[in-house]
Amino acid sequence: MAENQQRVLIASHRGRFSGNIVENTLPAFETAIRSGADIVETDIHLTRDNVMILFHDPTPLRLLGLPGKVSDYTLEELRACRLKNVIGEPSDWHINTLEEFLRAMKGRVMINLDQCWGFMDQVYDLVEKMGMEDQALIKGRAPYDEAVTWAKNRHWKPKFIPIIAGDKEIPLFEALPKEMDIPIVEVFLTGDEDKLISPDFVAGLKHRGIKLWVNSLSLGSGIDLSAHHDDDVSVTDAPEKGWGWLIDHGVEVIQTDWPSELRRYLDRIGK
């Protein structure tokens, strides 16, 4: 990430998916890269035959029309179905494995691997096998005990992104061992005066060389991660009210569903 230290980074949520391009597929990640993403985020599940696949939901109903859980099916059974596109019609795409994803992304962008703590050793054994330790980012929620214990048992230091969901969790973040590799901190914002976006907190992160990550995702009514400075207001009203506000308050990584629009805005303002 050294070459990107001076600019705002774009994290593309599940790749760039729209129309017939389905979330968490190689076409979605290729599209995200072409749209200007610096980081691509994906979710991982295990199949019944212990294959790591790219999939967000615990159930395959929404994208594959299958009942039960993802873990009820083998990779072959899941790949027998075509993924549904954004209007619920079968697309031309099928589920991808984590290994396929890593091969496609190697040497190109940072990768944020999500929803995989239950089989983290398996994930990072593959990351290590493919020589992608410097590209991989893993998030964790407070109190972070699992991440600390796991990191101590590795012979290389995983890049860990602590998630701080409220100012009461700041002491837990500050208590993390200094030897942990923490390039980024993700925060959930509840309002414009949130302590997690205060000048003092942001300055403290900068002093440690840690970037501040906020999700500008608009995930549905009642779900707010950015104090309403989100994708919706940025693309339907004015980016200055959404992405611009976050940047003005020290945010250096924005996770979005609109990477190309955010890239154009960043280019326009020189960020």
Regions found by a protein language model. Give the residues of each.
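Phosphate-group recognition and catalysis centered on beta-loop-alpha active-site segments
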Residues: M1-K271
